[in-house]
Design a protein with these regions (language model features):
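A short, N-terminal "cap"/entry segment at the start of jelly-roll beta-barrel domains
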Residues: 1-34, 69
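Conserved short histidine dyad/triad with adjacent acidic residue
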Residues: 23, 36-53
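Short, conserved beta-strand element in jelly-roll/cupin
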Residues: 41, 52-67
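A cytosolic small-molecule/anion-sensing beta-strand core signal
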Residues: 62-63, 78-79, 97
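Short acidic-glycine-tyrosine-enriched beta hairpin
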Residues: 72-87
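Ligand-binding loop in jelly-roll beta-barrel domains
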Residues: 87-110
Length: 110
C-alpha cells in the first residue's frame, strides 16, 4: 500500500507505534525538493548495510533501541535521542529491539 506524503502545513502523527509496530513499514512522510522525512520501522535484529547519503541527516529514535555505526563505532539511540550525521558520512543501522525512528534527509548537498 502506497503512503501519501504530507502537504505543506499538514500535521503528521509521529507517536510510538507500540504493539502495532510489527504491522507497519518504513515510509516517507514528507518529500520536497530540499527535504525528506522518513518513518523508519525496524523489527528487532533488522540491519541496513553501510551506506551514505549526499546531504546531512538526523535520526530521532521514537521508540525502541537502535545502533548507528559511524566512524568505526556504534552509537546507541534510545527513545527520545537524536544523532546528526554530516553529508556523505558512511553509516549502518541495526535495530537492537523493535524500533521506529524519524529520519530527516537534507536533499541539497553542500
Amino acid at each position: 500500500m502506497a503512503h501519501r506524503h504530507a502537504s505543506s502545513g499538514e500535521i503528521v502523527e509521529l507517536k510510538a507505534l507500540g504493539d502495532a509496530l510489527e504491522q507497519h513499514v518504513t515510509h516517507a512522510l514528507i518529500k520536497s525538493a530540499q527535504l525528506e522525512l522518513v518513518r523508519l520501522v525496524l523489527p528487532a535484529g533488522k540491519a541496513l548495510r553501510e551506506h551514505r547519503v549526499a546531504g546531512e541527516i538526523t535520526v530521532l529514535c521514537v521508540e525502541g533501541v537502535i545502533d548507528i555505526r559511524v566512524q568505526g563505532s556504534d552509537r546507541r539511540l534510545a527513545a527520545g535521542q537524536l544523532i546528526h550525521l554530516g553529508a556523505g558520512e558512511p553509516h549502518a543501522v541495526r535495530a537492537v529491539t523493535s524500533a521506529s525512528a524519524l529520519l530527516t534527509i537534507c536533499l541539497v548537498a553542500p
